[in-house]
């Protein structure tokens, strides 16, 4: 299975593993699965740190550089096709970052791993619920 972690799942997988369900933990650890991250999640972590909603040590840039090297992840490149697909998967979702993640899952044929109720109700892409 090809899994795209949403931003919260990515951060929790590194910092708060107890927030992951047994099924999600198992899927992320399964070597048969590919685990992907979007540059949108990297950007979103930076924004959360700038707003003071997330604190990473020693700082956001160093933490993310280390996190991206420590855990082998595939990068879901942001493309024009992904941007255009945001209007198909969750056109009324209020969070643009979430719309990009849903569109990325659709375009790349990935399963979006999320706890977000709005994303779990999305159309045109598969999800793995963190419940």
Residue spans of the language-model regions?
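Active-site neighborhoods of divalent-metal-dependent phosphate/nucleic-acid chemistry enzymes
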Residues: 55-61, 69-117
């Amino acid at each position: 299975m090809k899994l795209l972690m949403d931003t919260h799942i990515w951060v929790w997988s590194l910092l708060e593993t107890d927030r992951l369900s047994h099924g999600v933990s198992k899927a992320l650890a399964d070597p048969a699965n590919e685990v992907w991250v979007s540059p949108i999640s990297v950007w979103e972590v930076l924004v959360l740190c700038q707003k003071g909603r997330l604190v990473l040590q020693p700082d956001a840039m160093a933490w993310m550089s280390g996190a991206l090297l420590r855990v082998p992840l595939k990068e879901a490149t942001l493309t024009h096709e992904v941007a255009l697909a945001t209007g198909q998967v969750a056109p009324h979702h209020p969070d643009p970052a979430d719309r990009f993640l849903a569109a990325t899952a659709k375009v790349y044929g990935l399963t979006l791993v999320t706890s977000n109720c709005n994303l779990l109700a999305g159309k045109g892409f598969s999800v793995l619920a963190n419940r």
